[in-house]
């Protein structure tokens, strides 16, 4: 188990790209769980937007779930999250090439190297009005939702069978 923090995601995924370019980092790597924006919840109707071209129907117009995005080609990690009532799992075909909005985070370089990777997210700018703004501060994080997100990842890790 490695805990890795990637930098410069907003600058064309530079941190995760640099990591994947070193073959030693990928040797014996069984999977990657990327957490990106996991602490914002909104319960008001209409507060949740979705990217175009999703292969399945969105669950609701409320932002009270975690999206877990993975590929159809590598379902192991994605399946580990399905048991959680907090998650909405999104299997994406063709490594996201038909839905480029799902390629905006650090999981994407791993997909292109054929490594099972998932993005766990509150959907960022599709829900959070503070995303990348001066008002994006720790006080906007829902501490209960954030703790539930952390527990969801722990539960998924325990459910994994490699």
Annotated model-derived regions:
Residues 1-73:
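Acidic/histidine-rich catalytic neighborhood of metal-dependent amide-processing enzymes
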Residues 43-162:
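Active-site-adjacent substrate-binding region
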């Amino acid at each position: 188990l490695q805990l890795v923090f990637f930098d410069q995601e907003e600058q064309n995924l530079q941190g995760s790209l640099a990591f994947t370019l070193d073959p030693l980092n990928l040797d014996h790597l069984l999977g990657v769980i990327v957490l990106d924006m996991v602490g914002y919840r909104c319960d008001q109707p209409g507060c949740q937007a979705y990217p175009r071209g999703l292969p399945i129907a969105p669950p609701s117009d409320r932002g009270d779930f975690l999206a877990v995005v993975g590929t159809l080609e590598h379902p192991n990690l994605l399946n580990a999250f399905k048991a959680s009532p907090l998650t909405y799992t999104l299997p994406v075909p063709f490594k996201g090439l038909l839905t480029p909005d799902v390629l905006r985070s650090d999981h994407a370089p791993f997909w292109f190297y054929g490594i099972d990777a998932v993005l766990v997210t509150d959907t960022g700018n599709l829900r959070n009005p503070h995303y990348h703004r001066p008002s994006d501060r720790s006080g906007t994080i829902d501490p209960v939702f954030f703790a539930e997100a952390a527990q969801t990842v722990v539960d998924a890790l325990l459910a994994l069978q490699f």
